[in-house]
Amino acid sequence: MEKASGRKSLALSTAENGIENAGLELTEEGINSEQTRRMEVQGHSLSDDVRPATHQRSYLQPLTKARTFCQRHASLFKKILLGLLCLAYAAYFLAACILDFQRALALFVITCLVILVLLLHFLKKFLGKKLTRCLKPFKNSQLRLWIKRVFAGVSLVGLILWLALDTAQRPEQLISFAGICMFVLILFACSKHHSAVSWRTVFWGLGLQFVFGLLVIRTDPGFIAFQWLGDQVQIFLAYTVAGSSFVLGDTLVNDVFAFQSLPIIIFFGCVMSILYYLGLVQWVVQKIAWFLQVTMRTTATETLAVAGNIFVGMTEAPLLIRPYLADLTLSEIHAVMTSGFATISGTVLGAFISFGIDASSLISASVMGAPCALALSKLVYPEEEESKFKSKEGVKLPRGKESNVLEAASNGATDAIALVANVAANLVAFLAVLAFINAALSWLGELVDIQGLTFQVICSYILRPMVYMMGVEWTDCPMVAEMVGIKFFTNEFVAYQQLSQYKKKRLSGMEEWIDGQKQWISVRAEVITTFSLCGFANLSSIGITLGGLTSMVPHRKSDLSKVVIRALFTGSCVSFISACVAGILYVPRGAETDCVSFLSTSFTNRSYETYVCCRELFQNTYLNGTNPPSFSGAWEDKAFSAMALANCCGFYNNTVCA
């Protein structure tokens, strides 16, 4: 009884005082002294352990409350931080523009683009449903039909009037227009199903190409914008020298082609991989694809692949729609292949720019080729099957699989090595084969007393009429025809390298004709040639395309083989029609050189301006036997005309220099 009472007293005492009571006293007589000492020791031990924990909780209590407050108002803090960052950027942006607007032009353009994208996003988010309700009356089928007819009629009349007024000043542009008609008729004659051609798709594609070319080539704002964009791309690609010079040395980078141009492919591949990881490439591709799909009424998959070919190569673009390749119709496969042959990739674009090819023309040709490729592919191989991808919802593009930006950059650079090796190997092989073919043809020609027979000469004769229909002057046609033939039978790298050599000769002030041989082509011919060569349509690309697509869908190898030749031919014609559009729209740009002022000063180096001005002076100079020569036009009564003539005769040979 006493023991039970003692246990009860112990339990009550412990419960009432708690384990934090360090002076716990056990008064029950039933508990011996040893148990008492053990309990005292335990009580002191527990008290020593618990007191610091209690103080720690009291110290952490304000931090806990602060963390809870931050979590509760996280969205508010994010908005405040974002607002402060925007204010700081606005201050920096205004300061940069006020100090030197020309220097801050790139920042201004980027800022405007970001603001435009954000405005479109918020308009769609907050006003999208209202705009849809406002446009609901236009869903009436009869109203839409009348709108289409009026739009088509106005467009046709406007085109006819514009051509009539514009070609009155430059009749040679009509040749390029006739070239477009010629290529369209040839492609229609080669069509797989003539009765199934959707002319709406064809005319929309050609119309979009023409409108974009009009904005970029003819209008001053568009031309200046793309010229500026091309300059920025060149400046950006110049940073490749920092890496390649460190690894390879300045001497190799400056003097050797392989170390000068090929590292740009690695740098550009790295940048494209980063942009793909961030989702920027997918976003731009989807917007372009949506626009083409809505206007041209093509399916989601083929349109997405066509839009992707503006930025990536003919083997990378099908990866965007890889899960859907197995279900594509033959017409859709043909469209995917055609777009690959008709455009170039972003990485190769950088290499061509490093050759000295005009960057704005290359960018314009790539973008203009997308709607034209889609249109002509539907002309040559119209749709007769039922596609599974007619929905306007489109196809979702995945983000990059890399875990961070550094991995994306590393993978992009590593993947570009294979492309660099492929380009270098092809250049070595094709140039060697071309040299052998030329030697063999020259030997065969000499057997029958035909001197100088080469592959380029044969191409210059066979392709000369076609090149003339693009709008190239007849005197430039042999050289342009050579490059077109080289591009188709070898590859575009060799052709663009040849074009860059002609351009360098012109800019260096070399005489146009030497011993009856033309040394360079006109600026107009350079632009048309740049457009006509912009694409992967060559014989070697057949194997690359078939190999890439067959690895993705092996069971459709026979279908791929059926349409690849048609796609190659169609892709070539896309580039030729783009060249015709450039021939229609091209006008000389830049202020003409004031030759009187230019030659009034002493000059020691030859340039294109030197050649043009000296040629003008030669044309206005007349020999008077033993008397000093006389001058006409702007050179008449100029005291320095004789000195300028002497300077020009020091650089160029002419009959008036005798």
UniProtKB/Swiss-Prot annotation:
It catalyses: uridine(out) + Na(+)(out) = uridine(in) + Na(+)(in); thymidine(out) + Na(+)(out) = thymidine(in) + Na(+)(in); cytidine(out) + Na(+)(out) = cytidine(in) + Na(+)(in); adenosine(out) + Na(+)(out) = adenosine(in) + Na(+)(in). Glycans are attached at N653. Keywords: Cell membrane, Glycoprotein, Membrane, Symport, Transmembrane, Transmembrane helix, Transport. The keyword Protease does not apply. GO terms for molecular function: purine nucleoside transmembrane transporter activity; pyrimidine- and adenosine-specific:sodium symporter activity. Its main location: membrane. N-glycosylated. N-glycosylation is required for localization to the plasma membrane and the transporter activity. It is found in: Cell membrane; Apical cell membrane. Pfam families: Gate, Nucleos_tra2_C, Nucleos_tra2_N. Belongs to the concentrative nucleoside transporter (CNT) (TC 2.A.41) family. Sodium and pyrimidine nucleoside symporter of the plasma membrane that imports uridine, thymidine and cytidine into cells by coupling their transport to the transmembrane sodium electrochemical gradient. Also transports adenosine, an atypical substrate transported with high apparent affinity, but low maximum velocity. Therefore, exhibits the transport characteristics of the nucleoside transport system cit or N2 subtype (N2/cit). Involved in renal nucleoside (re)absorption. This is Sodium/nucleoside cotransporter 1. It comes from Oryctolagus cuniculus (Rabbit). The lineage of its organism: Eukaryota, Metazoa, Chordata, Craniata, Vertebrata.
